[in-house]
Design a protein with these regions (language model features):
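Short glycine-/acidic-enriched loop or helix-start segments at secondary-structure transitions
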Residues: 15-16, 65-66, 88, 164-167
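Alpha-helical structural signal in soluble globular domains
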Residues: 45, 68-72, 98, 102, ...
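Phosphate-handling substructures
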Residues: 15-16, 20-30, 72-136
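Short beta-strand scaffold positions
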Residues: 56-57, 136, 156-157
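Active-site-proximal alpha-helix that buttresses catalytic centers in soluble enzyme cores
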Residues: 2, 6-78, 173
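A short, well-structured juxtamembrane/interface segment
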Residues: 39-45, 134-143
Length: 181
């Protein structure tokens, strides 16, 4: 059973974020021109694989990345389970109605209005998702992968989600082979 994890392409947030500066407050950031190039390069690598289905986080950057890599070859399963840990403004998502307007061929009906982490907000107005909450969410998802025997699937997700699942912090558009244990 092989799963291919792909971190999204460079987003507008990634392009300007500096840990030594304040959060640039770019919510649900789209990908950049460099991100588009990264996704097209990843497509060449992915085309060699025997992928049969694609699970995508509901953030704009992951959907755009998946569309550039896979085109309309597969229907995307949009899953909030593979979303990013909420740490910054870019990790606050868009509502299902806004996503439906931006991506009319995809189905977001199953998502809650607020499908990202909710909790006490910090000085920026961001409800930071604690590491232990991320770990629990990732563990539940990993068990689901095993129990459903999901195979030959690509998951377009995020750095902290992939790190929590594999121990590897991927670069933008990096492909990581994952075998659930």
């Amino acid at each position: 059973m092989t799963i291919y994890l792909i971190r999204h392409a460079q987003s507008e947030f990634n392009a300007v974020h500096d840990l030594n500066k304040p959060d640039p407050m770019i919510f649900d950031a789209p990908i950049t021109k460099l991100g588009e190039m990264q996704a097209r390069q990843a497509r060449n690598e992915v085309e060699k694989l025997n992928i049969k289905s694609v699970i995508v986080s509901p953030f704009t950057r992951t959907i755009q990345t998946a569309q550039l890599i896979f085109g309309s070859k597969f229907p995307f399963q949009i899953s909030a389970a593979v979303r990013e840990q909420l740490c910054n403004s870019c990790d606050v998502g868009s509502t299902p109605s806004k996503l439906s307007k931006n991506f009319p061929l995809l189905n977001f009906d199953h998502l809650n209005e607020c499908w990202w982490h909710e909790g006490e907000k910090d000085h920026r107005g961001i409800a930071v998702e604690p590491e232990e909450v991320l770990i629990e969410r990732v563990s539940i998802f990993a068990e689901e992968l095993k129990s459903k025997n999901i195979q030959s699937t690509a998951i377009v997700s995020h750095g902290n989600f992939i790190r929590a699942l594999t121990g590897i912090k991927p670069k933008n558009c990096e492909l990581i082979e994952y075998v659930p244990r």
